[in-house]
């Protein structure tokens, strides 16, 4: 049997529960009370098609044998941390969570996150190494799902800086590597898309700054400490109202569209599944009312951006964009018809 010591989460059994109870959950509860005005986990609801108690029972049943929670990605740490906290609190589900090795800048950080049920997504190397790492990760995730474990993974590599959350087909290809039938592999993963909604993004001004830096220099690379600053800002920054909305397993959609999906090529199936994940995440958005106070908030965020050659018009446009795109995607999802 192949081992996964280079990427696997540490298996610490009951000790994980003790650590959660004594350290992790009190800290997350502190952040919930101090850094959000409200937080809730919903099964369907909101402005989605899944409104009834029967819909909620269906989603709870989807979670019973473990699921792959594929989400939009806004915050490096808190996206997964609060999802894990909420699932554990409400349904006693503790998902394994993916974390990029680029974030493991120190040995103690790697030890800690693996201890907290994080597995490592290795992103280093040339094309051959990338392919080998993807195969290794895919086999590990499929092994966990074969044992009924739940998984968290973002729908794309890196955060969507502009708020335009779109599933990367490469993520789906990685998850189904080594499988003869793509749709069968997706079914075994039991993907339940989750929409993560923050009223305010503490890292919005840092993201806008990064977008100008990349615009001005396409070869720009993050300096040492940039990710650590984003992690700290995301953890301790105010997020306002927070909503995590779990949508049904893709298996229901696949059952309803079985004949049409089976006529497609594998690449067409990948694209169709990616679009359905996008739809379920977009339709699950919580759309927040924005008034004059929000414009003042954006002005304050603009002032916080420190950089040479500061293009205030561009930066303000990017700040608006990252809050506007979810609303536009939600509206488009409501108008969607067919595959």
Show which residues each predicted segment covers.
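Conserved nucleotide-cofactor-binding alpha/beta core module
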Residues: 96-131
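Membrane-interfacial terminal anchoring regions of lipid-handling membrane enzymes
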Residues: 1-67, 73-92, 96, 100-107, ...
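Residue-level "edge-of-site" marker
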Residues: 126, 157, 294
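Acidic beta-strand-to-loop metal/phosphate-binding motif
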Residues: 154
């Amino acid at each position: 049997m192949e081992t996964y010591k280079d990427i696997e989460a540490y298996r610490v059994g009951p000790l994980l529960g003790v650590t959660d109870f004594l350290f992790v959950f009190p800290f997350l509860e502190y952040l919930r009370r101090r850094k959000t005005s409200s937080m809730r986990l919903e099964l369907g609801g909101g402005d989605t098609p899944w409104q009834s108690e029967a819909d909620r029972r269906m989603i709870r049943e989807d979670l019973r044998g473990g699921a792959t929670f594929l989400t939009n990605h806004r915050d490096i740490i808190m996206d997964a941390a609060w999802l894990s906290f909420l699932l554990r609190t409400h349904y006693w589900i503790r998902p394994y969570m993916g974390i990029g090795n680029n974030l493991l800048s120190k040995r103690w950080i790697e030890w800690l996150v693996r201890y907290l049920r994080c597995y490592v997504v290795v992103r280093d190397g040339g094309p051959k190494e990338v392919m080998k790492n993807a195969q290794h990760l895919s086999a590990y995730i499929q092994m966990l799902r074969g044992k009924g474990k739940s998984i968290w993974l973002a729908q794309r590599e890196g955060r969507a800086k502009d708020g335009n959350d779109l599933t990367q087909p490469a993520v789906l290809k990685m998850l189904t590597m080594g499988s003869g039938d793509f749709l069968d592999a997706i079914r075994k993963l039991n993907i339940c898309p989750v929409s993560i909604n923050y009223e305010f993004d503490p890292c919005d001004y840092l993201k806008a700054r990064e977008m100008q830096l990349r615009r001005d220099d396409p070869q720009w690379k993050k300096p040492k400490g940039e990710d650590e600053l984003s992690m700290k800002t995301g953890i301790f920054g105010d997020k306002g109202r927070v909503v995590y909305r779990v949508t049904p397993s893709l298996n229901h959609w696949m059952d309803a569209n079985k004949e049409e999906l089976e006529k497609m090529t594998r690449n067409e199936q990948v694209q169709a599944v990616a679009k359905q994940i996008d739809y379920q995440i977009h339709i699950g958005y919580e759309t927040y009312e924005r008034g004059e106070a929000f414009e003042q908030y954006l002005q304050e965020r603009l002032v916080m951006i420190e950089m040479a050659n500061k293009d205030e018009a561009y930066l303000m446009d990017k700040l608006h964009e990252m809050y506007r795109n979810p609303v536009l995607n939600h509206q488009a999802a409501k108008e969607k018809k067919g595959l």
